[in-house]
């Protein structure tokens, strides 16, 4: 019996952490590798993609790595469209984070994956979407494919 793959919106801090980590066994690096192996579905929107490109540039991530990640996201990620008017203000400390939540809701995500403490205001869940950090999500992905 096949089970549905986990569907996640990765906050920009997750892939940025993977690329900045010097640890070859970094959980975020493993998470990105498992996504590339299509062990879970990554959802993105035009807005989250633009923010991702901006954060990669701000953090000085090597352009070739950025290009590969973006190309992979466009190839195997699932693009989510929604009306900007549908973005609910749920993260008062950082309204930009509402874009991540809106993408997750519109895309039928099972999870939002983030290291951002602003998401703590959601209490670990929003409209049935679990909000977890990268390590917790990696454990779920490992369990889903074993």
Which residue stretches match the model-derived regions?
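Hydrophobic/aromatic ligand-binding patch that stacks against planar heteroaromatic rings
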Residues: 34, 103, 123
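Active-site neighborhoods of divalent-metal-dependent phosphate/nucleic-acid chemistry enzymes
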Residues: 78-111, 117
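Residues that scaffold the ATP/ADP-binding catalytic core of kinase and kinase-like folds
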Residues: 17-19, 55, 122, 140-141
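Short, active-site-adjacent cap segments at secondary-structure transitions
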Residues: 15-16, 49-50, 119-121
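Acidic, PIN/NYN-like endoribonuclease modules and their adjacent C-terminal/linker elements
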Residues: 110, 117-146
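Short, well-structured N-terminal submotif of metal-dependent ribonuclease cores
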Residues: 1-44
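PIN-domain endoribonuclease scaffold, especially VapC-family toxins
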Residues: 33-87
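Short secondary-structure boundary segments
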Residues: 12, 46, 115-117
């Amino acid at each position: 019996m096949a089970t549905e793959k986990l569907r996640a919106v990765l906050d920009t801090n997750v892939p940025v952490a993977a690329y900045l980590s010097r640890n070859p066994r970094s959980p975020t690096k493993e998470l990105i590798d498992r996504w590339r192996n299509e062990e879970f579905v990554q959802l993105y929107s035009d807005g989250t993609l633009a923010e991702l490109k901006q954060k990669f540039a701000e953090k000085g991530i090597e352009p070739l790595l950025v290009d590969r990640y973006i190309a992979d996201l466009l190839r195997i990620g699932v693009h989510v469209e929604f009306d900007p008017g549908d973005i609910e203000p749920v993260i008062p400390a950082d309204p930009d984070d509402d874009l991540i939540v809106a993408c997750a809701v519109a895309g039928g995500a099972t999870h939002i994956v983030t290291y951002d403490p602003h998401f703590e205001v959601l209490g670990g869940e929003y409209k049935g979407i679990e909000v977890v950090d990268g390590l917790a999500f990696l454990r779920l992905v490992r369990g889903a494919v074993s």
